[in-house]
């Protein structure tokens, strides 16, 4: 099954779960996603942070996520680019801001996996999970690109790195696969 076909199937699953999806084609196929997530603290109450010098102040705990999925030509694995926005329009561009949003276990993985750079789905920059870390994950799983659960399993890795920001996409895929 081609990567484009897998993206189309994934887009159907995500759309059913309320994730906005658009397949865009530049020189390659890219699935553009958008969703909103409400951050909760460890006591399941809304997360509000006090403003500090360079750390994010969440006046509104709603984070808007823009993401792009493509096939990395050099590493031959899916690649996940993302840009979170606080308060509807403030892009989070500092590593400290991203780490503040992640669960403790995700922070360790994110430290080794996250980078910021040119996003092939936009004319700007975005955060991304480096494809060499994704390749390591697939080597550990020993899963073939033709496996129908290839992208679903890959999303579990993305969720390990970016939890709780990616919870809505995990829920959408889980719900679609149960029905």
Curated annotation (Swiss-Prot):
Keywords: Autophagy, Cytoplasm, Membrane, Nucleus, Protein transport, Transferase, Transport, Ubl conjugation pathway
Enzyme class: transferase
UniProt KW Transport keyword: yes
Protein name: Ubiquitin-like-conjugating enzyme ATG10
Cellular component GO terms held in the UniProt record: cytosol; nucleus; phagophore assembly site membrane
Originating gene: ATG10
Organism of derivation: Schizosaccharomyces pombe (strain 972 / ATCC 24843)
Protein family (similarity comment): Belongs to the ATG10 family.
Compartments where found: Cytoplasm; Nucleus; Preautophagosomal structure membrane
């Amino acid at each position: 099954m081609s990567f484009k076909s897998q993206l189309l199937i994934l887009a159907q699953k995500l759309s059913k779960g309320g994730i906005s999806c658009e397949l865009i084609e530049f020189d390659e196929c890219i699935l553009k996603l958008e969703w909103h997530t409400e951050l909760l603290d460890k006591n399941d109450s809304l997360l509000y942070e006090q403003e500090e010098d360079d750390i994010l102040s969440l006046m509104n705990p709603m984070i808007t996520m823009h993401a792009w999925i493509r096939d990395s030509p050099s590493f031959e694995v899916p690649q996940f680019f993302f840009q979170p926005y606080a308060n509807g329009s403030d892009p989070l561009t500092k590593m400290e801001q991203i780490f503040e949003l992640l669960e403790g276990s995700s922070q360790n993985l994110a430290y080794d996996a996250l980078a910021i750079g040119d996003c092939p789905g936009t004319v700007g920059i975005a955060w991304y999970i480096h494809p060499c870390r994704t390749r390591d994950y697939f080597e550990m799983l020993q899963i073939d690109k033709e496996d129908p659960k290839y992208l679903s399993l890959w999303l579990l890795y993305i969720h390990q790195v970016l939890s709780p920001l990616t919870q809505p996409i995990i829920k959408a895929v889980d719900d679609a696969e149960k029905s």
